[in-house]
Structure formats: C-alpha cells, structure tokens
Amino acid sequence: MADQPVVLVVEDDQGIQSIVEDALVEGGFEPAIAPSGEEAVTLLRGNRNGYRALVADVKLRGRMDGWEVARHAREIDPEFPIVYMTGASADQWPAHGVPNSILLQKPFAPAQLVTAVSQLLINRTTKA
C-alpha cells in the first residue's frame, strides 16, 4: 500500500467524502481525507512532499474554500495536480482555473474522478 500515490481530498460532506474515498481506493490511490480547508492546509504543510494530488471541493464550510486550499498547494509546488469539484456553475473556473487542473461538476461518476487524477499525474510525469 505504501507505493500507492497519496491524494489529499478536502470535502466537508461526509457522503461525498465516502464516494470519493471509495473511488480513489478502487482506482489504486491512497486517499487522505480533510473535512475542512484549514485541516487540508495543515496536512499539506506538514507533509509537503507526501501528496501527489489534491481533490478539492470548491465550496467548503468554514473560512477557507477549495480555491484557497489549492492556492496553498501551489505555493508548495506550482505544478501541483488539482481536481476541483463543484455543484455550482463553472462560471468562476476561468478566473481561478490554473494549469495542471481539472474541474468536475457534481454529480459525476466515480470513474470520472479516477480518470481525472490519473490524467493529471500522467501529464505531470511526462513533463518531468
């Protein structure tokens, strides 16, 4: 299990957390779940090189949203792979979207999430 890429997931809805976690495990990833943006940033800072990708809900309860968590991840690594999830309109995507990221609109199939993370990691590997 140690050779599986660890993906940090920040999602405040337990039902969606469970779906995302199950999908990532089935896809060969090791998910690390953070229920808030603040906790996700703490985990990122504490394990700067331990996470291979971030899956972030755009709209989170609390002081920090998914865009803010992604900004912190990109401070650590400007090319950090990020999958954004949103149930809202994607209107803000052009303003916030950054290279090496994918936006998934809820609801999405679990396989779409696995494909998105895999694609970002493959793209990152081929650039290196």
PLM segments and residue spans:
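Conserved acidic carboxylate
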Residues: E11
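Active-site residues of response regulator receiver
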Residues: D57-V58
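C-terminal output helix
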Residues: F108-L121, T125-T126
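Acidic, metal-coordinating helix/loop segments flanking the phosphotransfer/catalytic sites
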Residues: I33-A53
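Short amphipathic alpha-helix used as the core "switch/output" element in two-component signaling
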Residues: W67-F80
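Charged docking surfaces used in two-component/phosphorelay signaling
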Residues: S18-E26
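Acidic catalytic/metal-coordinating carboxylates
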Residues: S36, M64-V69
